């Protein structure tokens, strides 16, 4: 009995911790949010737990989360596309928030390319596989989109609470700029840098590579390129970066910012530094954006600048 009671208490405190974190964004209370699942889905408990968060007004139609034939997708391509389209065109909501990443967003882009741009711009949030949609929305529709924690992340107590708080401040207009502090210079070109300005693009490295040769291929010229990834061995990371370079996607860029890559092992950092030293543009590193505990919001397709802040640097993104 004692062991059972202990297990029950552990489960209870774990649940309370998750919901305590989910309840943090009081700034978002009663604001309509359309939740979409353009990639992988979630189990029924996760969906139920999200719906029970009282501080958030989440619109999560059951039809959008019905499983299809492929278990790694939230639903069929048709259902996922229609639910995403409904959310993007919904006049009563200003926020479209992705359930999670995983896989599947790129499968929807051929149909998205057939749509006319909505009259109303929205906040679109997500990361990882959702990078494909960031590229589409920013390049085709000219939207500013937010690389930030997915909705399912609200239930993960291991994630930093600031991930959600900073998102809430942006969505409610409480701040005029999003800031990433303590960027480190990775090459000698970056060290004397006083100012780099340009719009941000990029996201998950695997998805950026997937865009090459498609109608939604990433456009990097004149921009600051942000890249992050997970489950990539150092040699795979090196190969991916070489592919970007040989594809001509690093020509005429303003700078590169690397986010996290699998806890940034010594060999991973060696790969990044070695690659950076072969480039003639400033390259920076941050541990505040990616698949780790901290995932601060990054705003794509907005006027941004990297400025010197002593020995470190700061990324400032206008809203």
Predicted regions and their residues:
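N-terminal signal peptide c-region/cleavage motif recognized by signal peptidases
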Residues: 15-17
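ATP/nucleoside-binding phosphotransfer catalytic cores, i.e., glycine-rich phosphate-binding loops
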Residues: 260-319
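Short, acidic/small-residue loops that bind anionic groups at enzyme active sites
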Residues: 114-136, 144-150, 281-284
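ATP/NTP phosphate-donor binding region
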Residues: 20-92
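Conserved anion/nucleotide-ligand pocket segment
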Residues: 143-207, 213
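Sec-dependent signal peptide recognition
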Residues: 2-9
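Short Gly/Thr/Asp-enriched flexible loops that form oxyanion-binding sites at enzyme active sites
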Residues: 101-119, 135-137, 268-270
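Internal helical hairpin/lid segments
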Residues: 216-268
């Amino acid at each position: 009995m004692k062991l059972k009671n202990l297990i029950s208490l552990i489960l209870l405190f774990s649940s309370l911790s998750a919901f305590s974190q989910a309840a943090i964004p009081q700034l978002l209370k009663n604001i309509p949010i359309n939740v979409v699942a353009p990639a992988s889905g979630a189990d029924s408990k996760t969906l139920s737990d999200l719906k029970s968060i009282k501080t958030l007004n989440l619109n999560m139609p059951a039809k959008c989360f019905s499983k299809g034939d492929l278990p790694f997708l939230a639903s069929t391509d048709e259902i996922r596309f229609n639910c995403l389209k409904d959310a993007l065109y919904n006049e009563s909501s200003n926020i479209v928030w992705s359930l999670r990443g995983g896989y599947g967003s790129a499968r929807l882009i051929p149909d998205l390319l057939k749509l006319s741009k909505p009259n109303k711009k929205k906040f679109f949030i997500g990361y990882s596989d959702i990078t494909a949609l960031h590229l589409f929305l920013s390049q085709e529709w000219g939207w500013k989109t937010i690389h930030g924690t997915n909705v399912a992340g609200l239930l993960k107590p291991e994630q930093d609470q600031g991930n959600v708080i900073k998102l809430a401040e942006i969505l409610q207009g409480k701040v005029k700029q999003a800031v990433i502090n303590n960027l480190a210079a990775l090459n000698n070109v970056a060290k004397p840098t006083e100012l780099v300005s340009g719009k941000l693009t990029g996201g998950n490295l695997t998805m950026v590579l997937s865009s090459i040769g498609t109608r939604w291929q990433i456009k990097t010229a004149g921009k600051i390129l942000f890249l992050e990834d997970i489950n990539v061995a150092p040699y795979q990371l090196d190969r991916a970066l070489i592919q970007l370079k040989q594809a001509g996607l690093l020509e005429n860029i303003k700078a590169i910012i690397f986010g996290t890559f699998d806890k940034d092992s010594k060999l991973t950092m060696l790969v990044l530094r070695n690659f950076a030293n072969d480039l003639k543009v400033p390259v920076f590193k941050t541990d505040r954006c990616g698949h780790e505990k901290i995932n601060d919001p990054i705003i794509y397709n907005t006027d941004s600048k990297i400025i010197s802040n002593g020995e470190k640097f700061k990324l400032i993104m206008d809203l």
